[in-house]
């Protein structure tokens, strides 16, 4: 798996037109895209199908959570769309239902542990009596037990999460900020180099590429940083 298969560019733009322009600009440099609520509700599901049909990989970031049957029905339909990854909140019953529904489809299910925009104060306000680190590890273990394909977590937790998950499950890390970039609304961030060194398998980068004056140049800079982490020049 090379760097292009590990870098996921978040299409965090409000319209299909802007998404199409960005994909065209990035060209063959980018293979993998994340599509979330903003674009889905602007007609993004059909766009996601079209991208997948063109050979791109799609991470559908829907963070599903509902009763078992509803989750299973949704996952069955998404599995038919040719998506590569799908998120749901890492609640055990929902994860087990999703795993059963996606069996044999090739869809990689990812459990969302704790949003990278949340810190201990945010969790306490929401009624959780655990710090982000402890909750991430607990949900990672629950995802492994449910048979999920991987989890989404901050790169700051990736090393310990890898110990929980073992060598084969995916660790997808948002909140990635290239060296020298602004953190935005993310509270638990890491550079591409450090995230891969910590054990992440896939990195989600949106704003530093999408909002860059030259998105293709920004994407190549991230890819180069990833290559340096995986294949250091002096080795």
UniProtKB/Swiss-Prot annotation:
Keywords: Decarboxylase, Lyase, Pyrimidine biosynthesis. The active site is at 63 (proton donor). It catalyses: orotidine 5'-phosphate + H(+) = UMP + CO2. CDD domains: OMP_decarboxylase_like (cd04725). GO terms for cellular component: cytosol. Disulfide bonds: none annotated. Belongs to the OMP decarboxylase family. Type 1 subfamily. Pfam families: OMPdecase. Catalyzes the decarboxylation of orotidine 5'-monophosphate (OMP) to uridine 5'-monophosphate (UMP). Its EC number is 4.1.1.23. Substrate binds at residues 12, 34, 61-70, 116, 177, 186, 207. It is an enzyme of class 4 (lyase). One of its GO terms (molecular function) is orotidine-5'-phosphate decarboxylase activity. Homodimer. InterPro entries: Aldolase_TIM (IPR013785), OMPdecase (IPR014732), OMPdecase_AS (IPR018089), OMPdecase_bac (IPR047596), OMPdeCOase_dom (IPR001754), RibuloseP-bd_barrel (IPR011060). Pathway: Pyrimidine metabolism; UMP biosynthesis via de novo pathway; UMP from orotate: step 2/2. GO terms for biological process: 'de novo' pyrimidine nucleobase biosynthetic process; 'de novo' UMP biosynthetic process. It comes from Rhizobium etli (strain CIAT 652). This is Orotidine 5'-phosphate decarboxylase. NCBIfam families: PRK00230.1, pyrF.
């Amino acid at each position: 798996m090379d760097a292009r298969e590990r870098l996921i560019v978040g299409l965090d733009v409000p319209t299909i037109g802007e998404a199409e322009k960005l994909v065209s600009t990035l060209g063959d440099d980018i293979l993998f895209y994340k599509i979330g609520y903003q674009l889905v509700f602007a007609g993004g599901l059909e766009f996601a199908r079209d991208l997948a049909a063109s050979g791109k990989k799609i991470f559908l970031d829907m963070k599903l959570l509902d009763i078992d049957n509803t989750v299973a029905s949704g996952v069955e339909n998404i599995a038919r769309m040719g998506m590569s990854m799908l998120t749901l909140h890492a609640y055990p019953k929902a994860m087990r239902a999703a795993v059963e529904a996606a069996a044999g489809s090739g869809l990689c299910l990812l459990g969302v542990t704790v949003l990278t925009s949340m810190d201990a104060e945010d969790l306490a306000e929401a009624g959780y009596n655990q710090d982000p680190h402890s909750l991430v590890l607990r949900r990672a273990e629950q995802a492994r037990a449910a048979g999920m394909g991987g989890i989404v977590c901050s790169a700051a937790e990736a090393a310990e999460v890898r110990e929980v998950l073992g060598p084969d499950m995916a660790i997808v890390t948002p909140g990635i900020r290239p060296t020298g970039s602004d953190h935005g609304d993310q509270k638990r961030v890491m550079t591409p180099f450090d995230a891969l060194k910590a054990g992440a398998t896939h990195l989600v980068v949106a704003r530093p590429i999408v909002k860059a004056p030259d998105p293709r140049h920004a994407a190549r800079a991230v890819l180069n940083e990833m290559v340096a982490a995986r294949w250091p020049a002096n080795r």
